[in-house]
Regions:
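Calcium-binding acidic motifs and repeat modules
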Residues: 2-82, 88-190
Length: 190
């Protein structure tokens, strides 16, 4: 009887070991997936929370002219005033719209959304959140009733080969989406 139990155990233990190891691997995978979901949810919330302010539109915290070599060395570039818009892009928008605050606000909002394609997208959900914010910014541009060259803003934001490649690569996450469902403009400027 003892010998027959040992013989059965010899044949049964390996499948049991394999099942136990498989279960542990599955649990580890699921824990990692839950962390990824939390990371995505936090990133999406941060994307939707990023707004330009009236101080940004008025130029209260206007940054100094950045060193171009240092600014172009990374995808993010330099953003000294931490408003989500690269300093060279922000200064170019102020130069193009010096007296029209409404147009400047819409252009800054659009530039901020375009910058997020480079810095905030890492999966389909984050791409969708950025696309919704870009759509809001586009509607804000339409509300200004001013001729705003949005293609020029895209070119300002993606002005190096690395930035162009990153933007193109991030469009691999493209998916359908709706609107953000809020007021299109971050600021109410008249």
């Amino acid at each position: 009887m003892k010998d027959s139990l040992r013989a059965v155990w010899r044949w049964v233990r390996w499948p049991l070991y394999i099942l136990a190891v498989g279960y542990v691997l599955l649990v580890l995978y699921d824990v990692q997936r839950l962390f990824d979901i939390d990371k995505t949810n936090e990133a999406v919330a941060a994307i939707h929370a990023q707004k330009i302010t009236l101080a940004d539109v008025q130029g209260t915290n206007l940054p100094p002219i950045p060193d171009q070599a240092e600014n172009d060395a990374t995808i993010e570039g330099i953003d000294k005033n931490n408003n989500g818009i690269r300093d060279d892009v922000e200064l170019a928008i102020f130069k193009k719209y010096p007296s029209d605050k409404k147009a400047r606000g819409a252009a800054l909002q659009y530039a901020s959304a375009e910058q997020m394609y480079l810095t905030k997208v890492f999966n389909t959900e984050t791409w969708k959140a950025v696309a919704e914010e870009t759509g809001r910014a586009g509607l804000c541009i339409l509300e200004t009733e001013t001729e705003i060259d949005w293609e020029n803003i895209q070119e300002l934001v993606a002005n190096t080969q690395l930035r162009k490649e990153t933007r193109t690569k991030n469009f691999e996450f493209i998916t359908s989406h709706g609107s953000a469902g809020e007021n299109p403009c971050d600021t109410a400027v008249n």
